[in-house]
């Protein structure tokens, strides 16, 4: 069994594995993921299930969009996993296989499959909640609904899985807000670059 690492240990190991400067826009995101993975690794009841794998790979992918150089992203993900006692390759494989299993399904079919695959009680975490949200948001009927109907659909599914609806709504809200803020920040940076370029002409 691997030794439990402190957050400080994980950060030190991460920087040994990833010896590059992380662009300022992404530093907070990377730090938050590292701390969260470290804390989950200390929870005795936590299990690395397929929902956790989907949540981790897909939120990482979404929140690091536009990261330069792009070729560093695989190493960045691997370094986050290594420094918190997780296996990056295994997580990616489980995520890919599981998402394929849930693709092209209605929200009702997704809920049915979620219940079938959840043999034991799901360990609640932000990453797991986001994994479920990502599966639901990719369902055939989800995109056809308005925001009120979407929120109700999400709440109903979390309740039927015996997970906190309020916690899920909060986690999803923060996640969507983070994506929005990242997009706004990237637009401002791009606008500034254009202005700076015009000044040099």
From Swiss-Prot:
A Pfam family per the record: ThylakoidFormat
Keyword field: Coiled coil
GO biological process: photosystem II assembly
InterPro entries in alphabetical order: Thf1
Coiled-coil positions: 174-201
Covalent S-S links between cysteines: none
GO cellular component, one term: plasma membrane-derived thylakoid photosystem II
Role of this protein: May be involved in photosynthetic membrane biogenesis.
Family statement drawn from the similarity comment of this UniProt entry: Belongs to the THF1 family.
Protein's UniProt name: Protein Thf1
Name of the gene encoding the protein in the UniProt record: thf1
